[in-house]
From Swiss-Prot:
It comes from Dictyostelium discoideum (Social amoeba). InterPro entries: GATA_TF, Znf_GATA, Znf_NHR/GATA. A zinc finger (GATA-type) spans 320-345. This is GATA zinc finger domain-containing protein 6. PROSITE patterns: GATA_ZN_FINGER_1, GATA_ZN_FINGER_2. Keywords: Metal-binding, Zinc, Zinc-finger.
Length: 623
């Protein structure tokens, strides 16, 4: 019988009216759910013959009897009795009937339904779920026999097998009593009959006896069939129990039932259908139950109150994967993500995970700080390398410039007199003019002034910068500035490669007859004393010098070219040309200045080539 079919015969308002009804209704729900689950399992694999149908038969019969008992208690009328006494229904409406109604209304099943009706009146199903777990048989008062003790468990067929004899005796006694009552009524109604009717009464008595015998035979046959069915079922159950049961992973929900307080015992029983300590078997009928008795105050009979143990919510096993515990107050998640750990192991695992997370965060922070430090160090190293490379490049540029300046054919810087004695060793790219005496300056100045005033244009101002001192001179070279007056002893720029020398400078030793190498390159000269002759023939180098009466005579200067000590015009045409030796550099950035300088050089060449070759006494020449 299905659950939806039971709702048709049980009024919904009657469930909450009596606690007994609630108990029966909960049991109907439980058994109907188990019947549906087991039947669906069997239908999913019809080819397999290892399924036991005894559990389905047992629970469906229990549902049937509980509904019968429920309706009789509520409405004082059995619905089974109503089906048996109803007139037959047309076969056209069989399609609209349910399967249960078709079975009940089938005439071939009428005798079986009658036996079930008598069986439901004899046994009280509601007494099965009490603490003693044995049915109470309704027997007449004259019977003093007690039912034998039930077998272990709540097996319904064990209850049937233990009470079949009592049911048989009760049914026979009820039939005899009914027959006796009817017989007495018939005798009282026929008391005034004549003697002719005595023969008919004897015949009637014989017929009644035959009817009773037939009824007894029928009942005996029905009981024998029930005994055979019970034996077959018990044999199958024993075979299943003897074989090794295979554990299943399905877990059933625990159900709690409450029995109303009775004067003898006011207790509530809680049944748990999934005791984790005992493995479940494939047969649903052999599911174990554990009963825990708790008083109305909520205090258990044990020494201490324990929280209810939750079953494992995973399907692979029913134990803790760490410690093997099968019961715990709460199942916790393990490393696999499933709730496979008990409460204690789960707490320990959570603490370990939290510590590992904290360590991972610390390691991440440390690694980030290390990367930041490494990046900052690398940036500093790169900056230092760039600075070093820049310094090296600057040094290389300075060295290249110095090498270029060293190879240029420029005049050697000599010391010159100035206001401060500290600037005597500084070198100048353009030599200072040599100082002439007051006697010879007038003739040379007049000659140069006449040349420069007629041929050379005015020279723009130039700026020379020294590295040792920050003095800046910007003389303007013109024809007026080249005035060699005898009154003023200021030096005059004769040539960029000619410098004036002092009397303290080293001269050629006129007393010795040796030709040693002279200091300084290129050769410069200084004429201190000479006659007022306007023409000097020629000068000779130190290689051609000869000693004559303590005086130096120079000759063969006609081939001497002073322009070889001046930079070439191609070199002078550059916009920024460094002229000088050492730290002193002069920048020539104007073409007009270069033109003026070349004019001075040509004038000096004409001057010296026009001088007479004979040099008077008192002339000292330093080469």
């Amino acid at each position: 019988m299905e659950f939806q079919e039971a709702l048709k015969y049980i009024p919904s308002n009657s469930i909450c009216s009596n606690p007994n009804y609630k108990l029966i209704w909960k049991k109907i729900q439980q058994y109907s759910y188990e019947v549906n689950s087991s039947s669906s399992l069997i239908l999913s694999d019809i080819s397999s013959s290892s399924y036991d149908l005894s559990g389905i038969f047992e629970k469906s019969l229990m549902i049937f009897l509980m509904i019968e008992n429920f309706t009789t208690q509520y409405s004082n009328q059995s619905y089974l009795y109503r089906f048996l006494n109803e007139p037959p229904i047309n076969n056209n409406n069989n399609n609209t009937k349910s399967e249960f109604q078709q079975i009940i209304t089938d005439p071939s099943n009428k005798e079986s339904l009658k036996s079930l009706l008598q069986f439901s009146k004899t046994i009280n199903i509601s007494k099965i779920f009490e603490n003693n777990t044995q049915p109470i048989i309704i027997s007449p008062p004259q019977q003093s026999q007690q039912p034998p003790p039930p077998t272990s468990g709540n097996n319904f067929f064990s209850i049937l097998s233990s009470n079949i004899n009592t049911i048989n005796n009760n049914s026979n006694n009820n039939n005899n009593n009914n027959n006796c009552k009817s017989y007495k009524k018939q005798q009282t109604s026929k008391g005034s009959a004549t003697a002719s009717t005595n023969t008919t009464t004897d015949i009637y008595d014989e017929q009644q006896m035959k009817l009773q015998q037939l009824q007894q035979q029928y009942y005996q046959q029905q009981l024998n069939e029930l005994q055979q069915i019970n034996q077959q079922i018990s044999q199958k159950v024993n075979l299943l129990q003897q074989t090794t049961p295979t554990t299943t992973n399905t877990s059933t929900t625990a159900t709690t039932t409450t029995i109303p307080p009775s004067p003898s015992n006011t207790t509530t029983t809680t049944t748990n259908n999934n005791n984790n300590n005992i493995p479940q078997q494939t047969s649903i009928s052999t599911a174990s139950t554990s009963i825990k008795i708790i008083s109305e105050d909520g205090v258990s009979n044990n020494k201490r109150k324990r929280r209810p143990r939750a079953p494992a919510p995973f399907l692979d096993s029913l134990y803790c994967h760490s410690c093997g515990e099968t019961q715990t107050s709460q199942w916790r998640r393990g490393p696999d993500g499933c709730k496979s750990l008990c409460n204690a192991c789960g707490i320990r695992f959570a603490n370990i995970v939290s510590k590992e997370k904290a360590l991972a965060v610390k390691e991440k922070n440390i690694s980030i700080n290390m990367l930041l430090n490494e990046s900052s160090n690398q940036q500093q190293q790169q900056q230092q390398q760039q600075q070093q490379q820049q310094i090296i490049q600057q040094q290389q540029i300075i060295q290249q410039q110095q090498q270029k300046d060293d190879h240029l054919p420029l005049s050697r810087p000599s010391s010159f007199s100035s206001q401060s004695n500290s600037q005597q060793d500084d070198s100048l790219p353009l030599s200072r003019p040599s100082s002439f005496s007051s006697q010879s300056s007038s003739s040379s100045s007049s000659f140069l002034s006449s040349l420069l005033s007629s041929s050379s244009p005015p020279i723009p101002s130039t700026t020379t910068t020294t590295t040792t001192t920050t003095t800046t001179t910007s003389p303007t070279i013109s024809s007026e500035s080249l005035n060699f007056s005898s009154a003023t002893n200021t030096p005059t720029n004769l040539s960029p490669n000619l410098q004036s020398i002092n009397h303290n400078d080293k001269l050629i030793n006129n007393n010795n007859n040796n030709n040693t190498a002279l200091e300084g390159f290129p050769p410069t000269f200084n004429i201190n004393n000479y006659n007022n002759n306007n023409n000097i023939d020629k000068l000779s180098s130190s290689k051609d010098s000869t000693e004559n009466n303590g005086y130096n005579y120079y000759s063969s200067y006609n081939n001497y070219n002073i322009s070889e000590y001046v930079p070439s015009p191609a070199y002078q045409n550059s916009r920024m040309t460094n002229v000088g030796i050492g730290s002193f550099k002069r920048k020539l950035s104007n073409e007009d200045q270069l033109n003026g300088l070349s004019a001075i050089v040509t004038a000096s060449e004409q001057l010296f080539f026009g001088i007479s070759n004979d040099v008077n006494q008192g002339s000292n020449v330093k080469l």
